[in-house]
């Protein structure tokens, strides 16, 4: 291999080149961040092993502060520039109109037509005041006898017809505007969702290192819903209210400008109250949204690793962590709602004062003979309607401010220019390339940990068509090589070259399409096996081949990866859905599909980041042969902890501390006896010793040997008999039920709860009310003041009638007119103060109730989700994305029956009730005629409420599906990026949203028809009232006062009934949300952690027995996993389970942990059936260390303490378990020690470091039974040796069951059970099994590490 260029001059030159390349404007990557792939060394920001002793440790949970120069002080200027470019994010100023930035010409046209209709609908009501004034003058004329009856009747009928025409116009305009705004609201929100997802897929990995997948889900669901709320029907309602306000004031000024001007003065006070209040509301709304986003990330982390949380019983601790974010959000939410309540109270107070002022001044103008009563009434009525309509703008103001606050977050991501953009066309595309990769003086620092250098001055040549293997301890920078070749990050110094071209100058998407990556923890997408493998063809020359050709390529790749046979054994073959993140497959099966995906496109460059670590020895041997074959003729970079897999590599590079320690072939390095030799020694299965053991055992009694064979055969026979028994049961069941279902699917189908429970409205109201039981005092205060506030309008109608009758007094009584006017004006002012106090107190009380309801509902829903057993999470509808989205969206919707909505409904109900009673008391004839229309109004409102609830039910599932899909893609962003699947992901998401949009349009058209009817009926009601009341007045049955009391009461009452219906969407959403919650809370899992049932164990010996256990996964009832398993473990024994992928080893562990219960047979511990034991008590004696370690956001200490219930663990205990897990020295080398934050999903640590933290957590429980599901598969040889020694020590005195693919780790087991197809085919010690030369012997030979000759 040529010596790498050295010397200062060449380094300066390459850094200079890099500067030029990286400073070219706007290049970008796809993101490589909070990927559930739990990157090991990738953003192994734990390569902290090399942290400078004085290096200030950063809080990795938070974003790096780019203005904090101390973080970058040790770096050169161009290095700072490279790091800052990868983290930089613009702060975006968002106004309401920027919510419309994606509107097309068609959208704008619809919005304009809808706006014109909304304005026209708003103008109708003030025009009604002109007719009102005209009729009032006629009423005065007929009362005083100055107008003949026939003239009065003609004027009355003409004006009443005008009312009818106005009603028809109102119906048409309201309908058009409602449909238009709801349609464009949904359409534009869809575009925002699509653009946001596209922007997320464009981001570089460093951006994801600080962003959780849960936050993305929250933004794409809850936050876009807030935007939709802000640009849908509420815009129409606001424009209507505003048009009413403007038109009313124009009418008032035209009729009599002096009086109008005096009344307008109070509007200034109104505007000041609204403006001041809105500023604070926006501020608090933003803070509340941020807190919920952080909570969403916690929820996503926990739900996606539910098996771990269940095994350790950490549900309560993790729920408390989630609740701290909820409490923070509640604090800001209450402040926001209190300000809103006071703002509305202030507005009503000012309005009532306005009437008092207008009436008082109007009386002076009437006495001065400047105006008549009709003009004063038109002006006052216009000002009254105008001011009230301005009041209707306020509640919608909250929706607009929330929408703008949510958009600020979303647009800042959309507007961020990623420095590594997979969509960009910039950069060269090479027509032909060989595949020579060279690292030249490369220095690398992860942007989210600027104080740690993870790679220093690495020069390495990886020739075309050759295999280069990277080995070394965890955190030595091996996976960083992969990250740099894939251009997930920008190096801060030196160059990475492909055939002599700096890869920074090449087109990013093209580059990634030439490379295939298989990582240690493979991510599959929730679709069929076929589609998963087909993803490997995206962007390649095969992408647009015929369907048959693509199927042929996929099947060939599966054969090469040794996956074809197990796929064909599945009932649906290649069309089998793998479930979320591939959970329905075993680790080895997932890995083989990931390998097939990588090789299907015949790539020039293959990156294997521990590609076979999850495979059993047999699969590994075959797959390794396939990979060796696949590697022929292409550049291959292999990272391996299992050294047997890289013996044949052309060049082996041993890395330590971010530098190259040595390189050469296997034989050369073994002869050199350096770093590599030590690693090999640690892992070698010493065959010489085996040979000796064989000789020593050769003189064993032959009978014993025979006996062993018989035992094996007996076991096989008995297990086949028991399987026949189950088959017999199944046949009987089939005869009985007449279906082709197996007995197990019959058993399993019972376990799936009822999909759609029907709950009555009363049940749901009681259910929601229970959340607010502790706030009963606040509720009563809120309700009391809602009643008082509701009495404001009927009182005002009474005062209004008094005012009109006072103004209608003849000239001879002007002295009385002035005296009465003064008194009634003062009354208006008093009612105004009462309204301010009532609404402020009512707003505050309900704010507290509403926010606490949301917090409790979220908290309890989260706890209910964590209560469910594992089969609940296996179901497709309960994916991490769907559940996270449910927590963020549906809880918000519950507030539709609390807070402001509930207060308003009670107020309007009081108004309607009081108005009817007063009207009936004063003039029953007219009151009854007016009241007859009210039920029609109510029916319209309830129908609309019903329609919206139906619409909500339909749309929810579609948006939940698309949200879940987006969450899955963003949480696996590294995989999406390496497959260049960005446009494919976006396309699928786009199609899901389009489908939903078409569905919802029909529903909107129907429900808007009913809403428009409810608005128009007000005018018909008024027309009827005026016609009948006028007739009574003409016949002198009623005085003006009696007419106006009845008329005003019912008019304002009917309007109030109309207001209730504008809350129908909120109530519809709340009803639907409540049904979802009730269903969740009612679903009692079979294995219930809340239950006190079952025997609680005081102690445990650790004797375990599986008796004839049959098992199938609930989501796969047709696929048997265990077929009559018999297995026994004595207390304190160390048992190992080995065998090929998918043979039931991990299932055995899952049954022991009671993640599931056996379908037939039983699992016994100390002779007790574990299904009869209390599940929490039982699990407290167990500890599980699984293949994919799970850490949560928080510090190393917090993660270790999750192993136990109590927090007061002594420092000595903590240090002891860390030393036992070989993690103590590493933790102490970190600047912040145990208080180091591990990042989202432990992303700041490498795979090996995460696994050792997980082992420390398991040991902290001091378990009686230790379950190791490939606990050391993520470790390099050196760590593995120490951790294995620690595990061996930890196993003493306790029962240990280990699933192992790496056989060197289980040589010393007391008994090794060899599994095949859900049964045990042989068992014995390592020596016995080697001597038997059976299945185990084959596995050992496959894994041998002898020299290559």
Curated annotation (Swiss-Prot):
Q: Which GO terms describe its cellular component?
A: membrane; plasma membrane
PROSITE patterns for the chain: ABC_TM1F, ABC_TRANSPORTER_1, ABC_TRANSPORTER_2
Q: Molecular function terms in GO for this entry?
A: ABC-type transporter activity; ATP binding; ATP hydrolysis activity; ATPase-coupled transmembrane transporter activity
List the Pfam families. Answer: ABC_membrane (PF00664), ABC_tran (PF00005)
Q: Supply the alphabetized keyword list.
A: ATP-binding, Cell membrane, Glycoprotein, Membrane, Nucleotide-binding, Repeat, Transmembrane, Transmembrane helix, Transport
Query: Compositionally biased, Basic and acidic residues: which spans?
Result: 35-45
Q: Where are the transmembrane segments?
A: 108-128, 162-182, 234-254, 257-277, 339-359, 371-391, 779-799, 828-848, 896-916, 926-948, 1016-1036, 1043-1063
Which compartments is it annotated to reside in? Answer: Cell membrane
Q: Which cysteines are joined by disulfide bonds?
A: none
Principal location = membrane
| Domain ABC transporter span(s) in chain numbering | 437-682, 1104-1342
List all annotated glycosylation positions. Answer: 308, 878, 893, 1126
Under the heading InterPro entries, the entry gives: AAA+_ATPase, ABC1_TM_dom, ABC1_TM_sf, ABC_transporter-like_ATP-bd, ABC_transporter-like_CS, P-loop_NTPase, Type_1_exporter
Q: Which GO terms describe its biological process?
A: transmembrane transport
Coiled coil location: none
Q: Where is this region: Disordered?
A: 1-62
* Residues involved in ATP binding: 472-479, 1139-1146
Start and end of every ABC transmembrane type-1 domain?
Answer: 112-402, 780-1069
Q: How does it sit in the membrane?
A: Multi-pass membrane protein
> Catalyses which reaction?
voriconazole(in) + ATP + H2O = voriconazole(out) + ADP + phosphate + H(+)
Explain the induction of this protein. Expression is induced upon voriconazole treatment. Expression is up-regulated in sreA deficiency strains, probably in response to accumulation of toxic compounds. Expression is up-regulated during biofilm growth. Expression is increased in clinical azole-resistant isolates.
Q: Which SMART domains match?
A: AAA (SM00382)
Q: Which family does it belong to?
A: Belongs to the ABC transporter superfamily. ABCB family. Multidrug resistance exporter (TC 3.A.1.201) subfamily.
What's this chain's function?
Answer: Pleiotropic ABC efflux transporter that may be involved in A.fumigatus adaptation to azoles such as vorizonazole.
Report what the protein is called.
ABC multidrug transporter mdr1
Question: Lineage of the source organism?
Answer: Eukaryota, Fungi, Dikarya, Ascomycota, Pezizomycotina
């Amino acid at each position: 291999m040529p010596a790498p260029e050295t010397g200062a001059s060449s380094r300066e030159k390459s850094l200079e080149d890099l500067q030029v390349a990286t400073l070219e404007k706007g290049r970008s990557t796809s993101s490589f961040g909070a990927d559930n792939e739990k990157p090991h060394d990738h953003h192994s920001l734990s390569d902290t092993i090399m942290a400078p002793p004085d290096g200030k440790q950063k809080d990795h949970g938070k974003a790096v502060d780019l203005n904090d120069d101390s973080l970058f002080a040790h770096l050169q200027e161009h290095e700072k520039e490279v790091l800052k470019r990868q983290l930089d994010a613009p702060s975006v100023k968002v106004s309401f109109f920027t919510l419309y930035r994606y509107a097309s010409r068609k959208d704008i046209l619809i919005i304009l037509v809808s706006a014109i209709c909304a304005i026209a609908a708003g103008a109708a009501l003030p025009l009604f005041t002109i007719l009102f004034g005209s009729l009032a003058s006629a009423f005065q004329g007929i009362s005083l006898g100055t107008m003949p009856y026939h003239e009065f009747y003609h004027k009355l009928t003409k004006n009443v017809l005008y009312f009818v025409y106005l009603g028809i116009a109102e119906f048409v305009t309201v309908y058009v505007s409602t449909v238009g705004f709801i349609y464009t609201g949904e359409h534009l929100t869809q575009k925002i969702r699509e653009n946001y997802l596209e922007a997320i897929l464009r981001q570089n990995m460093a951006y994801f290192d600080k962003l959780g997948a849960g936050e993305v889900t929250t933004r794409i669901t809850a936050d876009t819903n807030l935007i939709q709320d802000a640009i849908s029907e509420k815009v129409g309602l606001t424009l209507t209210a505003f048009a009413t306000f403007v038109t009313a004031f124009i009418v008032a000024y035209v009729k009599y400008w002096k009086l109008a001007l005096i009344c307008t003065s109070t509007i200034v006070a109104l505007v000041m109250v609204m403006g001041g209040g809105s500023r604070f509301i926006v501020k608090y709304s933003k803070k509340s949204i941020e807190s919920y986003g952080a909570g969403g990330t916690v929820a996503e982390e926990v739900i996606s690793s539910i098996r771990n949380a269940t095994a350790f019983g950490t549900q309560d601790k993790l729920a408390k962590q989630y609740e701290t974010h909820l409490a923070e959000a509640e604090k800001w939410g209450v402040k926001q709602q209190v300000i809103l309540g006071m703002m509305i109270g202030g507005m009503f107070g000012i309005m009532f004062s306005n009437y008092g002022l207008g009436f008082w001044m109007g009386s002076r103008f009437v006495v001065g003979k400047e105006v008549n009563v009709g003009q004063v009434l038109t002006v006052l009525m216009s000002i009254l309607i105008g001011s009230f309509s301005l009041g209707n703008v306020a509640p919608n103001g909250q929706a607009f401010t929330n929408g703008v606050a949510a958009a600020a977050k979303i647009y800042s991501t959309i507007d961020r220019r990623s420095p590594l953009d997979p969509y960009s066309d910039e950069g060269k595309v090479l027509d032909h390339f060989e595949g020579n990769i060279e690292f030249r003086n490369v220095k690398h620092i992860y942007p989210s940990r600027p104080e740690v250098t993870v790679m220093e001055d690495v020069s390495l040549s990886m020739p075309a068509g050759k295999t280069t293997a990277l080995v070394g301890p965890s955190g030595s920078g091996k996976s960083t090589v992969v990250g740099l070749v894939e251009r997930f990050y920008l190096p801060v110094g030196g160059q990475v070259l492909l055939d002599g071209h700096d890869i920074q100058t090449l087109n990013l998407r093209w580059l990634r399409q030439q490379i295939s990556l298989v990582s240690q923890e493979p991510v599959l997408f929730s679709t069929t096996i076929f589609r998963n493998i087909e993803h490997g063809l995206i962007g390649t020359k095969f992408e647009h081949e015929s369907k048959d050709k693509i199927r042929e390529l996929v099947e060939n790749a599966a054969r090469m990866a040794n996956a074809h046979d197990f796929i064909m054994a599945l009932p649906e073959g290649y069309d089998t859905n793998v479930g979320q993140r591939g959970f329905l497959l075993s680790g080895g099966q997932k890995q083989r599909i990931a390998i097939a995906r990588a090789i299907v496109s015949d790539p020039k460059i293959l990156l294997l980041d521990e590609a076979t670590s999850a495979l059993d020895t047999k699969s590994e041997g075959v797959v390794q042969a396939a990979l060796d074959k696949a590697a022929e003729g292409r550049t291959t970079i292999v990272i391996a902890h299992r050294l047997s897999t890289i013996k044949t590599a052309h060049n082996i590079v041993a890395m330590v501390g971010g530098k190259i320690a040595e390189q050469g072939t296997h034989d050369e390095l073994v002869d050199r006896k350096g770093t590599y030799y030590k690693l090999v020694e640690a892992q070698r299965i010493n065959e010489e010793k085996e040979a000796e053991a064989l000789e020593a055992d050769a003189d064993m009694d032959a009978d014993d040997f025979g006996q062993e064979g018989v035992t094996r055969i007996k076991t096989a026979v008995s297990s086949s008999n028991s399987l026949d028994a189950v088959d017999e049961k199944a046949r009987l069941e089939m005869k009985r039920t007449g279906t082709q279902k197996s007995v197990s699917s019959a058993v399993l189908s019972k376990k799936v709860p009822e999909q759609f429970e029907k709950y009555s409205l009363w049940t749901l109201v009681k259910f929601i009310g229970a959340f607010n039981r502790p706030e009963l005092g606040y509720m009563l205060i809120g309700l009391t003041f809602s009643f008082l506030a509701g009495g404001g309008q009927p009182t005002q109608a009474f005062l209004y009638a008094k005012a009109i009758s006072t103004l209608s007094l003849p000239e001879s009584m002007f002295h009385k007119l002035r005296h009465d006017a003064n008194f009634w004006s003062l009354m208006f002012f008093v009612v105004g103060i009462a309204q301010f106090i009532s609404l402020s107190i009512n707003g505050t009380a309900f704010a507290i109730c509403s926010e606490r309801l949301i917090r409790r509902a979220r908290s309890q829903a989260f706890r209910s989700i964590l209560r469910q057993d594992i089969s609940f999470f296996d179901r497709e509808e309960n994916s991490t994305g769907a559940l996270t989205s449910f927590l963020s969206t549906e809880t918000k919707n519950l507030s539709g029956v609390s807070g402001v909505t509930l207060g308003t409904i009670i107020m309007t109900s009081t108004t309607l009730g009081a108005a009817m009673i007063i009207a009936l008391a004063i003039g029953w004839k007219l009151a009854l005629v007016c009241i007859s229309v009210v039920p029609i109004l109510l029916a319209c409102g309830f129908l609309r409420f019903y329609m919206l609830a139906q619409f909500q039910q339909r749309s929810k599932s579609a948006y939940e599906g698309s949200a879940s899909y987006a969450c899955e893609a963003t949480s696996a962003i590294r995989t999406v990026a390496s497959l260049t699947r960005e446009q494919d992901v976006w396309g699928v998401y786009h199609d899901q949203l389009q489908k939903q949009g078409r569905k919802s349009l029909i529903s909107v058209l129907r429900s808007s028809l009913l809403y428009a009817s409810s608005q128009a009926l007000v005018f018909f009601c008024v027309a009827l009232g005026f016609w009948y009341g006028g007739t009574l007045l003409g016949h002198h049955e009623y005085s003006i006062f009696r007419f106006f009391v009845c008329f005003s009461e019912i008019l304002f009452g009917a309007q109030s009934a109309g207001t209730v219906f504008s809350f129908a969407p909120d109530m519809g959403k709340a009803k639907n949300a409540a049904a979802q919650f009730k269903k969740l809370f009612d679903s009692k899992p079979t294995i219930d952690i809340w239950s006190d049932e079952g025997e609680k164990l005081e102690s445990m010996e650790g004797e375990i027995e599986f008796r004839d256990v049959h098992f199938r996964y609930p989501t796969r009832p047709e696929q048997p996993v265990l077929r009559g398993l018999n297995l026994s473990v004595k207390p304190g024994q160390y048992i190992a389970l080995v065998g090929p992928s998918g043979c039931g080893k991990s299932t055995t562990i899952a049954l022991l942990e009671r993640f599931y219960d056996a379908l037939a047979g039983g699992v016994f511990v100390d002779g007790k059936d574990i299904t009869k034991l209390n599940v929490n008590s039982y699990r407290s004696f167990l500890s599980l260390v699984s293949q994919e370690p799970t850490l949560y956001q928080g510090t190393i200490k917090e993660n270790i303490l999750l192993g136990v219930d109590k927090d007061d663990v002594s420092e000595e205990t903590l240090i002891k378990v860390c030393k036992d897990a070989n993690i103590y020295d590493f933790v102490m080398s970190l600047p912040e020690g145990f208080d180091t934050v591990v990042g989202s999903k432990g992303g700041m640590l490498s795979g090996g470091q995460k696994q050792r933290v997980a082992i420390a957590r398991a040991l902290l429980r001091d378990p009686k039974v230790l379950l190791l599901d490939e606990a050391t598969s993520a470790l390099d040889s050196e760590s593995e040796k120490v951790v294995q020694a620690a595990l061996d020590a930890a196993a003493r005195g306790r029962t240990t069951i280990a699933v192992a693919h790496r056989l060197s780790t289980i040589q010393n087991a007391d008994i090794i059970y060899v599994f095949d197809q859900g049964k045990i085919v042989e068992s014995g010690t390592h020596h016995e099994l080697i001597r038997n030369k059976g299945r185990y012997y084959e596995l050992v030979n496959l894994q041998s590490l002898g020299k290559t000759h």
